């Protein structure tokens, strides 16, 4: 099973490391002014409720909105843009369970180097819905 890391994705598409950095810079230039206007950006961590742990991004199909998607461009994960832009603090927080029982999560993103904002937002979210305090929600061991 071949592992692919985010920096390699761009070079696998024929982009040089400099071009990959340029694209990341353009992404940051688009997103940064938006994040400066708000305390946090909140989104799901995945577009799907369940993805196999051993999914091969190169060849395993995933169904999104009823359509089979194959390849690294299928965009089921919402984390990679923020992983590419390492200056933005991101915190993943459990958000409950999908209809099939799989745990779901949200990610909280803040402006550059505002780590305290994501921690405070995550803390406040979990105070509102402390789902792990409910024994029924805990994993069976």
Predicted ranges, named:
Residues 118-141:
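Short, gly/Ser/Thr-rich active-site loops of penicillin-recognizing serine hydrolases
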Residues 19, 51-76:
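Short, surface-exposed loop/helix-turn segments at secondary-structure junctions
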Residues 45:
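Glycine-rich, N-terminal phosphate-binding loop of Rossmann-like dinucleotide-binding domains
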Residues 30-33, 69-93:
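Small-aliphatic-rich amphipathic alpha-helix that forms the alpha element of a beta-alpha
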Residues 102-111, 118-122:
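Short, well-ordered beta-strand elements
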Residues 1-32, 48-49, 53-54, 94-102:
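Short helix-loop capping/hinge segments that flank enzyme active sites or metal/cofactor-binding pockets
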């Amino acid at each position: 099973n071949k592992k692919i890391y985010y920096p390699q994705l761009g070079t696998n598409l024929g982009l040089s490391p400099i071009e990959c950095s340029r694209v990341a810079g353009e992404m940051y230039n688009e997103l940064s002014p938006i994040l400066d206007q708000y305390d946090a950006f909140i989104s799901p961590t995945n577009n799907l409720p369940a993805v196999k742990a051993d999914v091969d991004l190169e060849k395993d199909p995933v169904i999104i909105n009823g359509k089979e998607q194959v390849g690294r461009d299928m965009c089921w994960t919402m984390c990679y843009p923020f992983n590419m832009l390492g200056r933005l603090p991101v915190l993943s927080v459990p958000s409950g369970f999908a209809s099939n029982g799989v745990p779901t999560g949200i990610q909280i993103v803040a402006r550059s180097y505002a780590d305290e904002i994501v921690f405070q937002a995550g803390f406040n979210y979990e105070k509102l819905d402390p789902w792990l305090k409910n024994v029924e929600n805990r994993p069976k061991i």
